[in-house]
Amino acid sequence: MVPKRFRKENAGAREVKSEVFGDKKARNQLAHTSKNYDNANEQPRKFKNRVAKPKDNGKPKVKKARVYTEKELGIPKLNTAIDPEGAKKALRGKKGKKFVDNDQMNLLVSIVNEKIDSRNASKLEKARQLEMIREQKRKEIEKREAEKEAEIEQKKKEIKKTSRGKSADKVQKKMEELKKKEEGKGNSKKKSVSFA
């Protein structure tokens, strides 16, 4: 977008300036004081320079020596995976964990530690008990599955036996019937009946 041109407000109007600021003679007349006025003894005010003065308190400036980095000096990098013996820092504990050497404080700390240890121990015991219960449930489930499988196998065998048994029974019954018929034919004598 094209920026809008801002119109100067009252472009044709003139600014009103006092002669004191514009005319040197008028300024000098103001600076002149007469003995008849109250401010005759006062010295004319001096204008303050608004330029900031350096805060060196009159001391000469000393240039700081430039500190060069290792890259600029071309120093090879140390192997940071292995700390040199002299450069190891002393191990520090956590901040704010230093207690006063008082018997009461030590006693309190020991009591609190015992409570925490007992809580942790009870948690461990609970975890062990839960493990035992889980194992027992697992064993029960495995037993049930084994029993179900055994029942299924028995039923399969029974079904096979019955299907085989039915056909064998039928054959045996037929054989028995045939034998009976044959025996019946051989043993039976024709009886003759005579009428008188």
From Swiss-Prot:
One of its GO terms (molecular function) is identical protein binding. PANTHER family: 60S RIBOSOMAL SUBUNIT ASSEMBLY/EXPORT PROTEIN LOC1, 60S RIBOSOMAL SUBUNIT ASSEMBLY_EXPORT PROTEIN LOC1. Belongs to the LOC1 family. Component of the 66S pre-ribosomal particle. Residues 8-26, 140-156, 166-186 have a biased composition (Basic and acidic residues). It is found in: Nucleus, Nucleolus. The keyword Ribosomal protein does not apply. It comes from the Eukaryota. This is 60S ribosomal subunit assembly/export protein LOC1. Required for efficient assembly and nuclear export of the 60S ribosomal subunit. The gene is LOC1. It comes from Yarrowia lipolytica (strain CLIB 122 / E 150) (Yeast). Residues 30-42 have a biased composition (Polar residues). Residues 1-65, 140-196 are annotated as: Disordered. Keywords: Coiled coil, mRNA transport, Nucleus, Ribosome biogenesis, Transport. The lineage of its organism: Eukaryota, Fungi, Dikarya, Ascomycota, Saccharomycotina.
